Amino acid sequence: MIDKTAVIHPSSIVEEGAVIGAGVHIGPFCFVGSQVEIGAGTELKSHVVVNGITKIGCDNQIYQFASIGEANQDLKYAGEPTRVEIGDRNRIRESVSIHRGTVQGGGLTKVGSDNLLMINAHIAHDCIIGDRCILANNATLGGHVEIDDFAIIGGMTAIHQFCVIGAHVMVGGCSGVAQDVPPFVIAQGNHATPFGINIEGLKRRGFDKESLHAIRNAYKLLYRSGRTLDEVKPEIAELAEQHSAVQAFIDFFARSTRGIIR
């Protein structure tokens, strides 16, 4: 179904069965598959491919040569009906690729809302991206990677499959991330190591001085006490009881499967 207010360039192909919302604009030489749903106000600039079982929300801007919903690169993938879901108000720049999920990984690759995916960024199968994240040019995510809200991934950075990147993290450019990065941390290098707390980012997002101080203290316990994670967890948990912002560390530790960067 194509809404009567949608504008589709005559050179583009929209297969029968696709759902195209109000005010959608599809520029020249695009392809939209039969199982695609595109929400109101979204624009495909030109030469965009959206295929597979893909649902795109409202008011997204998708630039030329982006590829969304194509088959993933997992060698086990055998054409199962897996999906891609994208939220609202994302900016998906030139040559970004977002692959559909795998059965083994839950069948879904998901991108939230208000994200900026810069030129040539790659989101592999089964990745989960939160809201208000930035993936800079040529950032590459392996399969099953999770990126929490407000994280920034620098240009030319590669993240190993199954890694978790916590909220408000900043990963510097040209880094290689092979383990999980706790929330609020700045990471840099190959392999990436911690370089303190993303203080400026947290200030911009409204964290008060008391919360920043508590987060710093949790970081010091984690990285400067000379003790193991298991040894400092109880003290960080005590700190979280007094300062809610620190709870993000405790929740993150429960999710981590690859160990945290050191």
Curated annotation (Swiss-Prot):
Pathway annotation: Glycolipid biosynthesis; lipid IV(A) biosynthesis; lipid IV(A) from (3R)-3-hydroxytetradecanoyl-[acyl-carrier-protein] and UDP-N-acetyl-alpha-D-glucosamine: step 1/6
Assigned EC number: 2.3.1.129
Keywords from the UniProt entry: Acyltransferase, Cytoplasm, Lipid A biosynthesis, Lipid biosynthesis, Lipid metabolism, Repeat, Transferase
InterPro entries: Acetyltransf_C, Acetyltransf_C_sf, Hexapep, Hexapep_transf_CS, Lipid_A_LpxA, Trimer_LpxA-like_sf
Ranges that cross the membrane: none
Compartments it resides in: Cytoplasm
Pfam family, one: Hexapep
GO cellular component terms listed in the entry, alphabetical order: cytoplasm; membrane
One of the GO BP terms on file: lipid A biosynthetic process
Enzyme class, UniProt record, top EC level: transferase
CDD domains associated with the record: LbH_UDP-GlcNAc_AT (cd03351)
Domain of life: Bacteria
GO molecular function, one term: acyl-[acyl-carrier-protein]-UDP-N-acetylglucosamine O-acyltransferase activity
Subcellular location, principal: cytoplasm
Keyword presence, Lipid biosynthesis: yes
NCBIfam families (UniProt xref): lipid_A_lpxA, PRK05289.1
Function per UniProt: Involved in the biosynthesis of lipid A, a phosphorylated glycolipid that anchors the lipopolysaccharide to the outer membrane of the cell.
Family statement drawn from the similarity comment of this UniProt entry: Belongs to the transferase hexapeptide repeat family. LpxA subfamily.
Subunit annotation: Homotrimer.
Protein's UniProt name: Acyl-[acyl-carrier-protein]--UDP-N-acetylglucosamine O-acyltransferase
Record gene name: lpxA
